[in-house]
Amino acid sequence: MSNDTKIDFKKMDGLTPGIVQDAQTGEVLMLGFLNPESFAKTIESGFVTFWSRTRQKLWMKGETSGNRLRIVSVSTDCDQDTLLFRVFVEGDGLVCHEGTVSCFTRPLTLDASASAREATRG
């Protein structure tokens, strides 16, 4: 990421989504949120650090479990309001707090997706 890239933290009340992807497999592992402070800490440390919306504090993913997310590369989307971190997962590779590699483990059926679309229209 070039030094002149400015991340847009204004659209979501000071936060921007951070998508985490395994650099080797391409699998999407998780989504978290960053504020300017957590983004600066991420770039400085080389490990993904989020802003915990629940605890209202910085949260280096894997700091306790040992499954830290070491950054291989970082990029932004065309609007500069979403970040993509390609990472190497340290430790046993289980990123999700439920003990799975990815947080995205609950498939939706097409019928459920259609029902969800209908619910949002009403």
Predicted regions and their residues:
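C-terminal binding/interaction regions
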Residues: S2-L15, Q21-L29, L34-G122
